[in-house]
From Swiss-Prot:
Superkingdom classification of source: Eukaryota
GO biological process, one term: histamine secretion by mast cell
Disulfide pattern: 17-23
Family: Belongs to the frog skin active peptide (FSAP) family. Brevinin subfamily.
InterPro entries noted in UniProt: Antimicrobial_frog_1
Organism this protein belongs to: Lithobates sevosus
Function statement: Mast cell degranulating peptide. Causes histamine release from rat peritoneal mast cells in vitro. Has antibacterial activity against the Gram-negative bacterium E.coli K12 and Gram-positive bacterium M.luteus NCT C2665.
Protein name from the UniProt record: Brevinin-1SE
Length: 23
């Protein structure tokens, strides 16, 4: 379970960055 949460926490900021173009 923890690796999944850690993966999501890593993935979400990059998705937000890609959508909003604010990194």
């Amino acid at each position: 379970f923890l690796p999944l949460v850690r993966g999501a926490a890593k993935l979400i900021p990059s998705v937000v960055c890609a959508i909003s173009k604010r990194c």
